[in-house]
Each structure stands twice: as C-alpha cells, then as structure tokens.
Swiss-Prot record:
Predominant cellular place of this UniProt entry's protein: cytoplasm
Coiled-coil segments on the chain, per record: none
Originating gene: rlmF
Family: Belongs to the methyltransferase superfamily. METTL16/RlmF family.
InterPro entries listed in its UniProt record: METTL16/RlmF, rRNA_lsu_MeTfrase_F, SAM-dependent_MTases_sf
Provenance organism: Klebsiella pneumoniae subsp. pneumoniae (strain ATCC 700721 / MGH 78578)
Protein name per UniProt: Ribosomal RNA large subunit methyltransferase F
A GO cellular-component term linked to this record: cytoplasm
Amino acid sequence: MKAQKPGLHPRNRHHQRYDLPALCQAHPDLQGYITLNPLGEQTIDFANPQAVKALNKALLAHFYAVKHWDIPDGFLCPPVPGRADYIHHLADLLAGDSGEVPKDATILDIGTGANLIYPLIGAHEYGWRFTGSEINPQAFASAQAIINGNPGLTRQIRLRRQKESQAIFHGVIHKNETYDATLCNPPFHDSAESARAGGERKRRNLGLGAESGLNFGGQQQELWCEGGEVAFISQMIRESQAFARQVKWFTSLVSRGDNLPPLYRLLTEVGAVKVVKKEMAQGQKQSRFIAWSFMDDAKRRRPF
C-alpha cells in the first residue's frame, strides 16, 4: 500500500509516494541518482542538488507534460508538490467568486524565478494564462528558455522584466491591463547571514557537516531582502492600492504564522475590503497564503 502525504490539496497530483520507475521512464537520467534506503526501498539522495533537479525534471515531464526544464546552478530547485498546492488553493479562491474554477484566468506571478514553476503548473492544470515578472537577468533568461523549449507554452506564458529594484507591481502591471489574481513566493530571510543560517539548518537536518560543500540553491532575490518577508509583503500591500481596479485578488505566501498580525493591520489601513487566509500542509510543513481584494463580492464576480 502506498503511503499518502498528509494535508495536500485533493486535486494535487502528488498524494502518493514517488513512483520512481514511472518517473525514470519520463526522464531516464533520474535512474543514475536512485539509491536504496535502510529499508531497501528505492529513493534518491535529497542532499544532492543534481538528484533533486533530475527528480524535478521527471515530475514536470510525467505530470505536467513539460519536455524541457532546466535551471542554472545556484538557483532554487522548488519542491513541486508544495508549489502545486498553492496553485490548487488559488483555483479554489477564484472558484469562490465565480462558482467554478475559471478556465481563462489571467495570473501575475511576482518573481517567477529561473524555474518558472507556478506558470508551468497553472497552465497545465487549469489552462490559465500567466505573466511572470523577474528582476534577475539570469533567472529571466532561464525562464524564457523553458518557455521556448516547450512550444505549447508560448501562448500561455509571457515574461516581463522588472527593471526597478524597489518596485513590485509598478513597471510590471501596465495601464488598462487586468488580472484575476497575483501570486508570490516572497524572500523569507532578512539578511544574507540569516539565509546562510537557514542553509546550515538544512545541512544539519540531513545529517551533513558544513564541509559537505552542498549548495541548497537560491540567489539573493530568492532568499532574502531588507526586513524579510514582512517588509516585502508590506510593500506589496501598499503598492497594490494603485492597482485596486485592475486585479481581483492579490495573494502571497506567508512562511510564518506570527508574521500575519502586522500584515492584517496594514491591510485594514489600506482599505482592503476582503482578506482571506488559506492554510496549507505538505507533510510536516505548514504554510499558508493570504489574499486581499479591494473589490466587493459583486465586482469580483463580474468579468473585466
């Protein structure tokens, strides 16, 4: 009997343990990274960044029909099941307005990253159209290479370069442009030192020493910003006021529950008329995203 992962969204494709033979068929290079755990079961070494990248290539090919996917060394290699959960819960949020999951939704992914993970999943699962913003030139080029390598995606995903280091929505959302929702996985740490300490914790959890030399990935824009995620999301909330009539739902992951109170206070200050929190769980990891809107229920139900 296959074990289920507790807490994943019902529509998430990753409830069962990884079917490694099927994944190897989708991406044969994965075979070279398969080992046996102490129980004699097949697994991969999750401390090996190349093994994790090969697993992601296999998952994206097998479940989401992504034939070309790669990221440069040193960039975040995202856990696919957790990223899929955000997309499915966002679909439920949109369905709450229209009565069903919209098939033609337009979504803005803030900081789409070198991996382009949210647009890849959302385009496949729901047929949504995505705009991905990105400030890092290398990440932008990587995301564009993924789109170009999967011709069917060119009609569903476009990229937009954020040229202003202090801006989030400004310069990305154009005049007269509308979105059903925005999503974002904000930088969590408030300094490079905090980000390094997080990497050390991962090493300890995997039973590795600092001398292991493993790179858990992540560029500065992916991992930290001045003031951490509260500062980043607070800026997002303030900027969102300028686009109150162009976006139905603004959303962002919030990694720590104790970061919510100051964000709720700010949402009240800026006049958000509806605020929703969606709790998520992937195995032992608890996460959540908050969503806010400046439109009442009747306005959100109407198409742009």
